[in-house]
Design a protein with these regions (language model features):
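N-terminal glycine-rich FAD/FM-binding segment characteristic of electron-transfer flavoproteins
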Residues: 1-191
């Protein structure tokens, strides 16, 4: 939202999940987003990171038809899989450069973005042309507080709901059919 405050533009939230995800979307809307889209369908269920990247990138392509995208922000990794593959998968499908593990946006112009990212050796400053996708770490920014009017407005907000009939999807690339990986078991490491 701070990038929007500084540079203008619109913020669209796109999330994939069950209908209960609307509550999380409402919270995000209270911080100043302009629009939200929830991708929700039983056919999306069981999607691994590859299938999830396919579904999200298909939605982003549709948004890009009417509202050109400059920057896609994604979380570093999902809490259920910890694979950190969905953001890079989306970038690859969109043909966008990707900057991962971003902890700070140093500068953004109409054509470029410069960020600071975490690496195993420390920190690195990198630049990419826009449009781009960045996966962000928690320390990227402090969450702003929503004002009471924004909270009240967001509580009434109804996101657009897109299902498998809303876009042209290849059924073999989503859900369990489109997921080459599966979890056979989960266990805590010894020690």
């Amino acid at each position: 939202m701070r990038l929007k405050d500084k540079l203008g533009g619109k913020v669209t939230i796109i999330s994939m999940g069950p209908m209960q995800t609307r509550e999380a979307i409402k919270k995000a809307m209270s911080f100043g987003a302009d629009r939200a889209i929830l991708l929700s369908d039983r056919h999306f269920g069981g999607s691994d990171s590859l299938a999830t990247a396919y579904i999200l990138s298909t939605a982003l392509k549709k948004v890009n038809e009417t509202e050109p995208i400059d920057l896609v922000l994604a979380g570093k990794e999902a809490i259920d899989g910890d694979t950190a593959q969905t953001g890079p998968g989306i970038a690859q499908r969109l043909g966008f450069p990707q900057l991962t593990y971003v902890i700070r946006v140093r500068e953004m112009t109409e054509s470029n973005i410069t960020v600071e990212r975490k690496t195993e050796a420390g920190r690195q400053v990198v630049e990419a042309q826009l449009p781009a996708l960045i996966t962000v770490e928690k320390e990227l920014n402090e969450v702003r507080y929503a004002s009471l009017p924004d909270l009240m407005k967001a509580a009434q907000y109804i996101p657009d709901i897109w299902d498998s009939n809303s876009l042209i999807f290849d059924a073999t690339q989503m859900g369990l059919k489109g997921s080459p990986t599966s979890v056979s078991r989960i266990f805590a490491p010894l020690g």
